[in-house]
């Protein structure tokens, strides 16, 4: 009996030492001086709408002594393409991943599987299922749409009777766009406005959509940067036939169309903060085994020509123009 008890105590002591060694190795690895490598997978990263985001990545990488590798490929069209590239980067030694997902159910499940290998942060859009179980950094999409519609109501003194509205977006299935549209529609209830059409440039029918072929409206509301820039160019060329433009965007082109008078309002999310916080969260997780990553909600600013160059908006404009 004494022999059995002694053996048990020896085994217990050995297991305790092993646990200490494993934890010590993890802490050593995570607190070592070798910079972590974070792979950033964004299909359209060269577009200027990502300038502030990339600047945020750069500043956080400098502060946390990390390496950020940005991967963007034109042929990244499906969730499988995205997952394949992520696996390649992990095989090359990436310690964490930031990804703008091609949002569908299959991609969501595969990202969850991938997160078992390395920490993953989702930016730019979310998945339809809430909660997805993945960590995200994004603005309050519904409230952005609501505030955009509220600015429209303010400019028309709450009376939109007889006004016809067209809603334009890049992707029909984007969860961010769906939430923004709902915010607009809920806010405009009872205003007298009629939403004449709501179309997306890329949709399930593969039909080519453009603004010039839509029925004439008084107001165009663009729900993402690409749509806002396209609508701004159309307004400049008089292809909106007098319709005024309100929208959401975060690029130098979007700011230009507002400043030049081709748009009345631009809601701009703080993408610098999104980039910075993405890196910060992942580094905290890599360097502290017990750290629980958090979802982050970034701020946004309602810009008009009147407040565009105000002192309080200088930092936002600076990061957008980087």
Role assignments for model-derived ranges:
Residues 10-25:
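Hydrophobic membrane-insertion alpha-helices, especially the h-region
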Residues 27-53, 70, 134-135, 163-173:
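Short beta-strand segments enriched in small/hydrophobic residues
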Residues 49-63, 144-151, 175-193, 230, ...:
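Short, solvent-exposed amphipathic alpha-helices that sit
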Residues 69-91, 196-215, 228-229:
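Structural motif
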Residues 98-116, 120, 200-255:
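Hydrophobic alpha-helical
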Residues 106-143, 251-259, 264:
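Flexible loop/hinge segments that line or gate small-molecule binding clefts
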Residues 136-162, 250-254, 269-287:
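Hydrophobic alpha-helical segments within soluble ligand-binding/sensing domains
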Residues 273-322:
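Hinge/cleft segment of the Venus flytrap/periplasmic-binding protein
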């Amino acid at each position: 009996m004494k022999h059995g008890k002694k053996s048990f105590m020896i085994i217990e002591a050995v297991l305790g030492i092993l646990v200490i060694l494993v934890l010590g190795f993890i802490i050593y690895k995570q607190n070592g001086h070798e910079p972590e490598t974070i792979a950033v997978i964004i299909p359209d990263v060269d577009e200027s709408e990502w300038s502030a985001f990339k600047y945020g990545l750069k500043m956080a990488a400098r502060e946390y002594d990390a390496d950020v590798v940005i991967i963007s490929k034109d042929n990244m069209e499906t969730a499988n393409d995205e997952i394949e590239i992520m696996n390649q980067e992990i095989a090359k030694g990436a310690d964490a991943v930031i990804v703008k997902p091609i949002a569908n159910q299959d991609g969501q499940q595969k990202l969850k599987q991938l997160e078992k290998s390395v920490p993953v942060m989702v930016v730019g859009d979310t998945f339809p299922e809430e909660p997805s179980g993945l960590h995200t950094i994004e603005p309050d999409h519904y409230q952005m749409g609501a505030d955009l519609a509220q600015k429209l109501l303010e400019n028309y003194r709450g009376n939109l009777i007889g006004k016809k509205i067209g809603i334009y977006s890049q992707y029909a299935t984007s969860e961010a766009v769906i939430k923004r549209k709902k915010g607009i529609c809920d806010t405009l209830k009872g205003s007298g406005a009629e939403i004449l059409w709501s179309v997306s440039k890329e949709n399930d029918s593969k039909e080519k959509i453009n603004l010039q072929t839509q029925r004439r409206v008084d107001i165009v509301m663009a729900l993402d940067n690409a749509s806002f820039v396209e609508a701004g160019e159309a307004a400049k060329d008089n292809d909106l036939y007098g319709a005024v433009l309100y929208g959401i965007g975060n690029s130098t082109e979007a700011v230009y169309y507002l400043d030049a008078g081709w748009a009345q309002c631009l809601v701009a999310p703080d993408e610098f903060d999104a980039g910075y916080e993405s890196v910060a969260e992942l580094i905290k997780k890599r360097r502290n085994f017990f750290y629980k990553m958090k979802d982050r909600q970034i701020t946004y600013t309602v810009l008009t020509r009147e407040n565009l160059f105000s002192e309080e908006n200088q930092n936002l404009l600076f990061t957008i123009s980087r």
